[in-house]
Amino acid sequence: MMDLRREMLGDGHYFTKGDTAFYSMNGFVADKEPWKEYYAKGGSFDDYDETVFMGLISSMNKAKNDPEIHNFVIDLSTNGGGSADVLLGLISLITGEREGLLKYQSVLQGQSIDQKFLIDRNFDGKFDEADADVHYDLNFAVLVSHESYSCGNLFPSMFRDRGYLVLGERSGGGACTILGLNTADGFYYHISSYQMRLTNDAGEVIDAGITPDVELVKTGADGKKDYSDFYDLTLLSNLINDFYAK
């Protein structure tokens, strides 16, 4: 899918066409050294737009300040997961929520567990009233596929719970707590943890994947899947505009 995206959109992570901006995020990663430098020296997120999360923030700021842009697609179609901290930070920037919340279910005992986080939404190193001043007046959508795993699966669930549009195909599932294992011959693989399962706001377990609001995969006569609609920005623009016009 990365090759198809590159073929249709070109190299890079941030693309625009008409009223729609599109950012490809292959993992929920916080690059520690750039963040340390940012907090030590200040500056602009534009100075760090080659990093993952800081690059996304830079792109959201560009879209917010562009009068032609009204829609913003977060592309998780090749996102294998990463840090729940980054995920909650992104949810906070989009929704305005100053507290992040992860919802779990214990596999062993069945009880529900909530884990809360405070979010420094303006990234000034303080949790205060100024965090409420960060706004992105954009129509957001998330794009997911069978490759969207772990946090790449949790994000569309939290996104939908908040009334935002999910596009693509059923996500790959997986919990945000995963185990790395090896076979006897050295093959390394990930599985979801046996101790906790992630749930949505209704308490439903989401580890089997999230079905999109709009399915974008086409199947040819030969049975082969066609993902070209994933990266058709004109089509995505029309779908987003129709969804938020309701």
Protein language model features and the residues they cover:
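Flexible, low-complexity junctional segments that flank or bridge functional domains
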Residues: 1-80, 84-92, 96-102, 180-182, ...
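Terminal peptide-recognition signature
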Residues: 23, 74, 140, 159, ...
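Gly/Ser/Thr-rich loop/hinge elements
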Residues: 81-139, 179-180
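C-terminal soluble interaction/assembly domains
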Residues: 169-183
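C-terminal "exit" segments of structured domains
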Residues: 179-204
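Low-complexity, Gly/Ser/Thr/Pro-rich intrinsically disordered linker/tail segments
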Residues: 203-246
